[in-house]
A protein has these predicted regions:
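Pyridoxal 5′-phosphate
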Residues: 2-235
Length: 235
């Protein structure tokens, strides 16, 4: 049995209740939170539900419902094929908005297309093909599962070796020293997540990039769990 020491600790837990009573009222803190107003911008079907799985699927913004309805009724519904005259540029236009607002990327560098998994597959496939004389792909064990499954399939298809850095202990964080032990002239691609989906650990993107590039490897970062959450300056 673990011994708990404390001058004010009582067996009936009264000291804990007293401490809790002295804490600020959570409702008061919520009301003063500058981000509190954003709650009303999302669809909340069950106000009693404490939803903590936003890394998998976030709540539906009310604005999204309005935008989709407008597109269906006023654009597709009325413009029909004529809508392609401006739809064709939407991937670039929306990509530029995402790039400037969340990625620190200048105009012309970001496209809003396909799904994360499709894009990840295409980019990693292109990177492997761009280094035909190299036979190794490096990632980490704590990376998002779908990314690892895609890498396994690509390596099997291209006859490459997949090396997964063991970072599942502690913060699930790949240090520069850890990466340096696994990259060399055989490394075609290094791919990691900017923010780890379980632990929330934030990687040192610039430093890890330099280590991989110094070895002649290409790098693909999955920013799915970082965009809009942490400040990024890809340029």
């Amino acid at each position: 049995m673990r011994e708990v020491r404390g001058a004010n600790m009582r067996a009936d837990g009264s000291s804990l209740r007293a401490n809790a009573a002295s804490l600020p009222d959570p409702d008061v803190l919520d009301a003063a939170d500058p981000l509190a107003c954003y709650k009303d911008k999302f669809v909340v079907a069950d106000p009693e539900l404490c939803y903590l799985d936003g890394n998998s699927l976030g709540r539906l913004p009310k604005r999204t419902v309005e935008v989709v309805q407008r597109y269906l009724n006023l654009e597709w519904g009325s413009e029909l094929v004529a809508g392609w005259s401006h739809w064709i540029d939407e991937a670039q236009r929306v990509g530029d908005l995402i790039g400037s607002a969340s990625l620190g990327a200048a105009s012309g560098q970001v496209l809003a297309v396909d799904t994360t998994s499709v894009n990840f597959y295409q980019l990693c496939d292109a990177a492997i093909r761009a280094r035909p004389d190299r036979d190794t792909v490096v990632s980490d064990m704590a990376n998002f599962p779908t990314d690892r499954y895609i890498l396994e399939g690509l390596c099997e298809r291209h006859g490459k070796r997949l090396v997964l850095i063991d970072d599942e202990a502690g913060e699930e964080y790949v240090t520069n020293e850890m990466l340096a032990r696994h990259v060399d002239v055989r490394t075609a691609l290094v791919t990691l997540s900017v923010v780890q989906y379980r632990s929330g650990a934030l990687h040192d993107v610039a430093r890890l990039n330099k280590t991989a590039h110094d070895a002649g490897a290409l790098v693909v970062w999955d920013a799915s769990h970082a965009v809009g959450v942490v400040d990024m300056r890809f340029d």
